[in-house]
Amino acid sequence: NRERLLYSTLPAGRRVFHLDFDGAGRLERVEQVLTLARFSGIALNTWTQADVERTFGPPMLVERVARFDGDIWTYRFMDDYEPRMAHIHIDRAGTVRQLVFSDDQPPGDDRDF
């Protein structure tokens, strides 16, 4: 029986690792999954909250906004060398409806862009 463990550096970090073990308990593979490519693979209107949590682990932040009837799960990640955030909108039925990316400006970074 194969097993996958998930190791997360969230909420402060920007990496989540899948650790895949073979039936004898030997580590076969380590993969960092908080990537733009992985987030872009989320199938809107198909993926569920369980799919998101199984792939990326618990989010760093869960929040609600007035114009969406559900939760927004936020993950921090690095896109090349740029700090970013992925905001996954999950409706009340547990289905992913929208994915939005934003820049993650570090606290105290008051540069005028």
Place the predicted regions along the sequence by residue.
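A cross-family detector of function-defining hotspots
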Residues: 1-26, 44-113
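Acidic/histidine-rich, surface-exposed loop or edge segments in extracytoplasmic proteins
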Residues: 27-37
